[in-house]
């Protein structure tokens, strides 16, 4: 800071709050503090000179010497006026910067010894450029900030005094106290101008943004006002023409609709209340749109509309038989359910949950139940739903809020008593943060769903007339939800059932879908059986339908390319041309009896599966290894099986210390697929015994059963699915736990007839049947 300092003078000090006075600046001040008034009176009685200096904190009424800045402005009092309330109004003019060297109080006011600051007057080309640039920038600022009078710009554009220019601009800028004081403390005028230019640049940018926002708001307001004005003009013109009666008031239409709906009292009061709000709002406001949307939803909800329910059980049976082949037990249970409903005239009762592998007809069964009862069919896919709001709706405070999917589907159905299918209920996403399954508890509980409350509608809705049916691939459903439903299991189809389904449903459906005439394509029974055996291996019929669809597409292409072709017959011999090489070896689980290899039977969400188990025994130190993505339960089964073998080593002719001198490796192929469960226990034990004794396992045998340490065989689940898997895989002999013998009565005869089934009580019986040679010595 280059400046010249003169001699020191003593002068009264007037502290200012949030005000910085610059040289060349004339400003009125209102003074109310007792010491400040005394300070002004002292100055008026002398040479009218006073030191004006800003307080660091405006909140302090009695500032000390440390509460004041060091640099201030010596000013002259031009005029003083005492006001009736005891305060004083003074008009002061800033003269020169000064620096406080010493300050003290004389008891009545502050007195300071100050040193005048004289900036060097050097005019060069740089300063001239700075003056011109600063004036131009200030002009841009004034154009955006209308609060500053344009006369000031006229005055400044003619001045050549850089000091006066800088201080005048600073006086008119809306600066913070710290920035105002910084301008005062910059002695070098060029630096002061640069500092002000930087501040003005920032202010100009802010003012431009402010102007853009203001213009946007103004345009929006003008648009709304224009639309309102035009609407009023149209109404006035229509009134003059006498057409106003033909255009009824929208609010009156809504009121009439609400009155005609026979809503429950709570819903009616809520809707009428919202309608009153709507009347008070501008039609163009955003809130009016939200309220109008809510009223529309309330009007669309089927509060009291019902379809007439059919009670003819014979007709229901006929519809189920036409739409679905087989599934006799399932149909019987559904008819029992419908019979009870027809007698009681109430829907209250257990919610049906159809559980089975993909493609067995769960969803289509729901459609058939709706058709047989005369109910409207509504389907809600729950797969992937992870938010409770998707079921219960969003509260209206959220932008774009809507009722939940449940109420949306009810609006779509337009009746209060549809059949509501909750599809894939086991596929809902649940974690520690979200649990949409909990929202379904109220829906599926007959005692609670009378008062279902959607967050958007905010009123109770009666779901007791709705017939809910759920579908799932597995029992992996939260326990409270499962407790509210009655389980009906749909197992996979047999080969004969698949053949009939293909002939009666899939083949005609794909013929129609691919625009084929009845005589253009013939698929023989042998061809369909070959597709089932060699191109699909599933519990349902989806893959079978895909293969038939593939044949139809290829036939359509051939008929178009070769006009001379009129008819194509697909049989087991030419099937390869249409579907390619065989994907599965039906009836060839193992061609030869092998050591250490056993076929187990497993149950999965997609039905039963054949599970190959391999065991190898090599010299080592007694290490047990298991591979193939095995779960904890299956690993424990292997350990239990090994303990059983050790306990019966003497009977089996195995050396007592085999577990110390041999490493045993158990592997279940298809290592990328996770596997778990206890039902492979006897298969593991058989594989280990076969490997240790070098006694081959019969190739046409499959087995299932949990093993205990005493060698007993415990009951298992999913027997029908497992026997179906054995049937599909061409297995001839199956070993099952003796306690599962009673379940054979529920399994269709056409499955059992193709299999030789041995119920076994212990591992001794298993080994005698499964191994090629008698294992016991």
Curated annotation (Swiss-Prot):
Q: So which domain of life are we looking at?
A: Bacteria
- Looking at the record, the residues that make up the Lon N-terminal domain are 11-204
What molecular function terms (GO) are annotated for this protein?
ATP binding; ATP hydrolysis activity; ATP-dependent peptidase activity; sequence-specific DNA binding; serine-type endopeptidase activity
Q: Name one Pfam family in it.
A: Lon_C
**Reaction catalysed by this chain?**
Hydrolysis of proteins in presence of ATP
Q: Report one GO cellular component.
A: cytoplasm
Q: Which residues bind ATP?
A: 356-363
Residue numbers annotated as active site = 679, 722
Q: What induces it?
A: By heat shock.
Question: One of this protein's GO BP terms?
Answer: protein quality control for misfolded or incompletely synthesized proteins
- EC number(s)? 3.4.21.53
Q: Which residues form a coiled coil?
A: none
Keywords in alphabetical order, please. Answer: ATP-binding, Cytoplasm, Hydrolase, Nucleotide-binding, Protease, Serine protease, Stress response
> Which subcellular locations apply to this protein?
Cytoplasm
Start and end residues of each Lon proteolytic domain: 592-773
Broad enzyme group: hydrolase
Main localization is cytoplasm
Q: How does it assemble?
A: Homohexamer. Organized in a ring with a central cavity.
Family of the protein in this entry? Belongs to the peptidase S16 family.
* Main function: ATP-dependent serine protease that mediates the selective degradation of mutant and abnormal proteins as well as certain short-lived regulatory proteins. Required for cellular homeostasis and for survival from DNA damage and developmental changes induced by stress. Degrades polypeptides processively to yield small peptide fragments that are 5 to 10 amino acids long. Binds to DNA in a double-stranded, site-specific manner.
Protein name, per record: Lon protease
Q: Which organism is it from?
A: Buchnera aphidicola subsp. Schizaphis graminum (strain Sg)
What taxonomic classification does the UniProt entry list for its organism? Bacteria, Pseudomonadati, Pseudomonadota, Gammaproteobacteria, Enterobacterales
């Amino acid at each position: 800071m280059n400046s010249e300092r003169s001699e020191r003078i003593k002068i009264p000090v007037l502290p200012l709050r949030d005000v910085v006075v610059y040289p060349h600046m004339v400003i009125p001040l209102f003074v109310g503090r007792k010491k400040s008034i005394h300070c002004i009176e002292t100055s008026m009685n002398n040479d009218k000179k006073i030191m004006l200096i800003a307080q660091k904190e405006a909140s302090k009424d009695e500032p000390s010497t440390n509460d004041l800045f060091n640099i201030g402005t010596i000013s002259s009092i031009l005029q003083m006026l005492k006001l009736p309330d005891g305060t004083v109004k003074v008009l002061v003019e800033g003269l020169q910067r000064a620096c406080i060297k010493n300050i003290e109080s004389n008891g009545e006011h502050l007195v300071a010894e100050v040193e005048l600051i004289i900036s060097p007057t050097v005019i060069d080309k740089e300063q001239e450029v700075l003056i011109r640039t600063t004036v131009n920038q200030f002009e841009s600022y004034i154009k955006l900030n209308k609060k500053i009078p344009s006369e000031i710009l006229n005055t400044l554009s003619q001045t050549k005094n850089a000091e006066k220019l800088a201080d005048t601009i600073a006086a008119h800028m809306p600066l913070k106290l710290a920035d105002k004081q910084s301008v005062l403390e910059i002695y070098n005028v060029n630096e002061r101008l640069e500092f002000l230019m930087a501040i003005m640049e920032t202010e100009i940018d802010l003012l431009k943004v402010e102007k853009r926002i203001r213009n946007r708001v103004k345009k929006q307001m003008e648009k709304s006002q224009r639309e309102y004005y035009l609407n009023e003009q149209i109404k006035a013109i229509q009134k003059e023409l006498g057409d106003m009666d033909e255009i009824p008031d929208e609010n009156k239409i809504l009121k009439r609709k609400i009155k005609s709906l026979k809503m429950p009292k709570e819903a009616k009061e809520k809707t009428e209340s919202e309608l009153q709000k709507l009347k008070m709002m501008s039609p163009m406001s955003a809130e009016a749109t939200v309220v109008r949307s809510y009223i529309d939803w309330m009007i669309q909800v089927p509060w009291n509309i019902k379809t007439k329910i059919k009670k003819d059980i014979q007709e229901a049976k006929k519809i189920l038989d036409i739409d679905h082949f087989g599934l006799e037990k399932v149909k019987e249970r559904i008819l029992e359910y419908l019979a009870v409903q027809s007698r009681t005239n109430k829907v209250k009762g257990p919610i049906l949950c159809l559980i089975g592998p993909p493609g067995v007809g769960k969803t289509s069964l729901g459609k058939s139940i709706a058709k047989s009862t005369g109910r409207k069919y509504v389907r809600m896919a729950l797969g992937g739903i992870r938010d409770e709001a998707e079921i219960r709706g969003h509260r209206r405070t959220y932008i774009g809020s809507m009722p939940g999917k449940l109420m949306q589907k009810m609006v779509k159905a337009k009746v209060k008593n549809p059949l509501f299918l909750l599809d894939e209920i086991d596929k809902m996403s649940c974690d520690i943060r979200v649990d949409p399954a909990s929202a379904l508890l109220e829906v599926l509980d007959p005692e609670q769903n009378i008062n279902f409350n959607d967050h958007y509608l905010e009123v109770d809705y009666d779901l007791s007339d709705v017939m809910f049916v759920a579908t799932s691939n597995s029992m992996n459903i939260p326990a409270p939800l499962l407790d509210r439903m009655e389980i009906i299991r749909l197992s996979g189809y047999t080969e004969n059932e698949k053949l009939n389904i293909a002939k009666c449903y899939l083949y005609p459906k794909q013929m129609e879908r691919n625009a084929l005439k009845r005589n253009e394509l013939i698929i023989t029974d042998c061809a369909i059986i070959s597709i089932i055996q060699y191109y699909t291996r599933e519990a349902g019929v989806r893959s079978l339908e895909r293969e038939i669809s593939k044949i139809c597409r290829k036939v359509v292409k051939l008929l178009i390319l070769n006009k001379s072709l009129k008819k194509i017959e697909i049989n087991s011999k030419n099937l390869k041309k249409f579907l390619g090489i065989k994907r599965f070896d039906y009836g060839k689980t193992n061609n030869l009896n092998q050591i250490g290899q056993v076929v187990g039977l497993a149950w999965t969400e997609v039905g039963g599966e054949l599970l190959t188990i391999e065991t190898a025994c090599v010299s080592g130190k007694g290490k047990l290894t298991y591979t193939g993505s095995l779960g904890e339960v299956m690993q424990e089964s292997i350990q239990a099986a090994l303990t059983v073998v050790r306990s019966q080593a003497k009977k089996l002719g195995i050396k007592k210390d085999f577990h110390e001198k041999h490493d045993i490796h158990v592997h279940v192929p298809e290592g990328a697929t996770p596997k778990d469960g206890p039902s492979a226990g006897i298969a593991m034990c058989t594989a280990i015994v076969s490997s240790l004794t070098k006694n081959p396992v019969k190739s046409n045998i499959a087995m299932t059963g949990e093993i205990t340490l005493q060698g007993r065989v415990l009951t298992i689940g999913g027997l029908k699915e497992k026997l179906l898997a054995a049937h599909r895989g061409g297995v001839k002999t199956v070993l099952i736990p003796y306690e599962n013998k009673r379940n054979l009565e529920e399994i269709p005869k056409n499955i059992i007839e193709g299999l030789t089934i041995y119920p076994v009580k212990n591992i001794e019986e298993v080994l005698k049947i499964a191994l090629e040679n008698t294992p016991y010595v």
